[in-house]
Design a protein with these regions (language model features):
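Helix-loop-strand module that forms the ligand-binding subsite of alpha/beta enzymes
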Residues: 62-121
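Short amphipathic alpha-helices and their capping/turn segments at secondary-structure boundaries
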Residues: 25, 35, 70-73
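N-terminal beta1-alpha1 ligand-phosphate binding loop
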Residues: 2-32
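Glycine/Thr-rich phosphate-binding loops of Rossmann-like dinucleotide-binding domains
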Residues: 13-16, 57, 91-92
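Cysteine-cluster motifs in flexible loop/terminal segments that predominantly coordinate metals
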Residues: 42-75
Length: 121
């Protein structure tokens, strides 16, 4: 089994990383492979609801200029997903929200049947 942990904090080794690292450590202690992917300072374009991802049916966003399609590819090869993000002004960090919206719309098929969790700090 493999779990993808996505660190949506702009601080590479901040509190979100600490929480995800401890989660990964516990998973690995139980024989579960864990990968932490940091997206924090990478540009993530917001979804414009153009619908092209649904038309093409390939679990990909037509905008291939950020990390979204890379994350979707990793999601396809994992068995569970954990998204971690800090909370700023009552909401998760902007990069994490934009990524979540794009992943769910463009890569929704990659999520089906997979457990998912969110860690906020």
């Amino acid at each position: 089994m493999k779990v993808l942990l996505i660190n949506g904090s702009p601080r590479k080794e901040g509190n979100t990383y600490t929480a995800l690292s401890e989660t990964a450590r516990q998973l690995e202690k139980n024989g579960i492979e864990a990968e932490i992917l940091w997206i924090g300072t990478k540009a993530v374009r917001g979804c414009i609801a153009c619908g092209k991802c649904r038309e093409l049916g390939k679990n990909r966003c037509v905008f291939d200029d950020d990390i979204t399609n890379t994350v979707i590819e990793k999601m396809e090869t994992c068995d569970a997903i954990i998204l971690g993000a800090p909370v700023y002004y009552g909401q998760p960090a902007a990069q994490a929200m934009a990524l979540q919206q794009r992943m769910l719309y463009a890569g929704g098929q990659a999520f089906q049947g997979k457990p998912a969790a969110v860690v906020t700090v």
